[in-house]
UniProtKB/Swiss-Prot annotation:
The gene is rplX. One of two assembly initiator proteins, it binds directly to the 5'-end of the 23S rRNA, where it nucleates assembly of the 50S subunit. One of its GO terms (molecular function) is structural constituent of ribosome. This is Large ribosomal subunit protein uL24. It comes from Wolbachia sp. subsp. Brugia malayi (strain TRS). One of its GO terms (biological process) is translation. Keywords: Ribonucleoprotein, Ribosomal protein, RNA-binding, rRNA-binding.
Length: 105
């Protein structure tokens, strides 16, 4: 089965403290039937790092994973949240935005 959200996609957060923010998917994390995505600038937490040989310690801002159900792909034409469908064009399976019909990616 093809994934509806892939790394590199522009997404918008639907729920949570970062609701309405837009970011790019950096990485998709799959662990035991839970699919999560790491999105740039979304769900940022502070991590306290101890100083080690070669690097100084301090407070590092780190993006944590957010559940796939809490984000939606942005329509490339209207810049609005959209659902994703699949269709075959020239014997290639492609994703398209259901709002505008534009091909994604």
């Amino acid at each position: 089965m093809s994934a509806k959200i892939r790394s590199g996609d522009d997404v918008i957060v639907l729920t949570g403290r970062d609701r309405g923010k837009i970011g790019k998917v950096i990485k998709i994390v799959t662990c035991s039937a839970k699919r999560k995505a790491v999105v740039s600038g979304i769900n940022v937490h502070k991590k306290h790092a101890k100083p080690k040989a070669g690097s100084s310690g301090g407070i590092i801002n780190k993006e944590l994973a957010i559940d796939i159900s809490n984000i939606a792909i942005l329509d490339p034409k209207y810049k609005a949240p959209t659902r994703v469908g699949f269709k075959v064009i020239d014997s290639k399976k492609v994703r398209f935005a259901k709002v505008s019909g534009e091909v994604i990616g």
